Structures are given as structure tokens and as C-alpha cells.
A protein has these predicted regions:
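Active-site nucleophile-adjacent alpha helix/oxyanion-hole segment immediately C-terminal to the catalytic cysteine
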Residues: 1-57, 67-72
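Generic preference for well-ordered alpha-helical elements
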Residues: 10, 27, 60-67, 106, ...
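Alpha-helix boundary/N-cap detector
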Residues: 21, 25, 132, 136-140, ...
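Short capping loops/turns at secondary-structure boundaries
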Residues: 55-59, 63, 138, 172
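Active-site-adjacent substructure of cysteine-protease-like catalytic cores
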Residues: 71-200
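Cys-His-centered catalytic/binding microenvironment captured across papain-like cysteine peptidases
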Residues: 161-166, 172-174, 183-263
Length: 263
């Protein structure tokens, strides 16, 4: 979805992404593009992890591989890690990982996650929970997402804020989803914010989601996820800044770094 959005809404991306082909390649072709990115020196440590070969395999890839692929075209892909404070030194000790000095800080995310199955899906109800630590962790991530989508708003209509911000690649425990928006309600006299992420999950059936959205019935069960569903110990996000890097800036993008946000 990141690539589809870039091709649809970013003029500068259309010219460089996948050789200016104007379409998203199939998986085998994406694997070849990733190997080409590695051969150009993007994410050297990540390439070594895969022995510089990914074509034809079914090996698990994640946020850093997506960043390497996008950066190889000059796109400014940024990674944000959400994790407990005790994990911070571990992230920074990983070759190629560092606190990005100029990454815009919207709020809370994770770099190397446990590579195991799990859809991360949760029941679509409001974010109430007796587990205060879980809600606190979720609130940090939710606030980051809210601030991200609130930046550079285009217009407001009936309480809906339109933005030109791209979707967020959302990684956790071997599964990736796409955050396309966020809801906020202000509760009580203290106007306490309550959030729900709007998430597209590749594990869901596209036709079912499309039907629910057209009929405006049942779509919440597919898209809405409250803070109580954020139960993983770590999370990772990727977004793409505007502009195309070249020269020295492009060389710096070869090293995959991340902005660490503490839960």
C-alpha cells in the first residue's frame, strides 16, 4: 500500500519508483528490486543476514528491508521504533541502527521484532482496559499516530480531517499492517482523548471490506483497533518524507537508522 500511495499521490515518486514503470511489481520482482538495493550498498548488515539473496525464497522480511528498497530509489523512508526504555541500548547496538538526528518526532515504535506468526487483530471496541500499563503503552503509540496525521492538514469537514500524509507501514511480531487513519474522541469534563487506529490488514478479505465500506455497515470490525489491542512488547513504523534524496544525502540513507520512542 505504501508503494501504491506513492505512485498515486507523489509526483516525484512516480518518476523514480521501480524505474518509472508507474505500477507496483509482483512479489518476485520486488525481491529482485530488493537485491538490487543491497547491491548498491543499502542496508549492508541486513543484506548479510539474508546472504545477499532473497529472490525465490519465502523468508520473512520486515521494516528495514522495506526502507532499504524505498531508499534505493532516493525516497526518504523513515523508521520509528516503539519499545520499553530497557530495550533502547539493544536497538542502538544493532549494526546500522541509530537515533536519526533529523527525523521529525511525532510521538512513539520498534526495530527488530520477534519473528513469529500472529495477525495482531483485535476486537473492534473502544480502548478501555483494566491494565493501565497496556493502555499507557497504547496511548504513546496512538498519540504519535494522531500527531503524524494531524500534521499538514488539508481541510476539515464534519469532524473529518483530510491530510496529504501517506499511510504508515505497521510492523509487529512477524506481521505487517497499514495504518490509514485514526479516530479521536474527547471524553468527560477533562476532555481525555480516546483513540482508535484505522488499519488495513492483508489477512482480511478485500471484497468484504469494500462491501462494508460501501454499505457503511460493519466496517468498524475490519478497520478500528483500540489501544487495548496493542499488546505486543514492541512495534515499528515506516513513513516516507517528501522529496528525493541525492548526493551525500542519498549516501547517508544507505545506513538504516531509526528514531526510538520509549513506551
Amino acid at each position: 500500500m505504501q508503494c501504491s500511495h506513492l505512485l498515486s499521490y507523489r509526483e516525484e515518486a512516480k518518476r523514480v519508483l521501480f524505474g518509472g514503470s508507474m505500477f507496483v511489481p509482483d512479489i518476485p520482482s520486488l525481491q529482485r528490486w530488493l537485491e538490487l538495493a543491497w547491491s548498491k550498498g543499502f542496508d549492508v548488515s541486513g543484506a548479510l543476514h539474508f546472504d545477499n539473496r532473497i529472490c525465490g525464497s519465502k523468508r520473512w522480511i520486515g521494516t528495514t528491508e522495506c526502507a532499504a528498497l524505498l531508499r534505493s530509489f532516493g525516497l526518504k523512508a523513515r523508521i520509528v521504533d516503539f519499545a520499553p526504555k530497557k530495550s533502547k541500548s539493544m536497538y542502538l547496538s544493532v549494526p546500522g541502527s541509530a537515533i536519526a538526528p533529523k527525523v521529525k518526532s511525532y510521538g512513539p515504535m520498534d526495530r527488530y521484532v520477534v519473528k513469529k506468526g500472529g495477525s495482531g487483530k483485535g476486537k473492534a471496541v473502544d480502548s478501555h482496559s483494566s491494565n493501565s500499563s497496556r493502555i499507557s503503552k497504547g496511548a504513546v503509540l496512538m498519540e504519535w499516530v494522531w500527531n503524524y496525521f494531524s500534521d499538514n492538514r488539508l481541510n476539515v469537514s464534519s469532524g473529518v480531517h483530510m491530510t496529504n500524509k501517506g499511510p504508515l507501514y505497521f510492523q509487529h511480531e512477524g506481521h505487517s499492517r497499514t495504518i490509514v487513519g485514526i479516530q479521536r474522541r474527547l471524553l468527560g469534563t477533562t476532555f481525555t482523548p480516546q483513540y482508535n487506529l484505522l488499519i488495513l490488514d492483508p489477512a482480511d478479505f478485500t471484497r468484504a471490506i469494500e462491501k462494508a465500506l460501501i454499505e457503511k455497515r460493519g466496517w468498524e470490525g475490519y478497520l478500528k483497533r483500540g489501544a487495548h489491542t496493542l499488546t505486543c512488547p514492541e512495534y515499528q513504523m515506516l513513513y516516507v518524507d517528501n522529496g528525493i534524496a541525492d548526493g551525500e544525502e542519498l549516501e547517508k540513507l544507505k545506513t538504516i537508522d531509526s528514531h526510538f520512542v520509549e513506551f
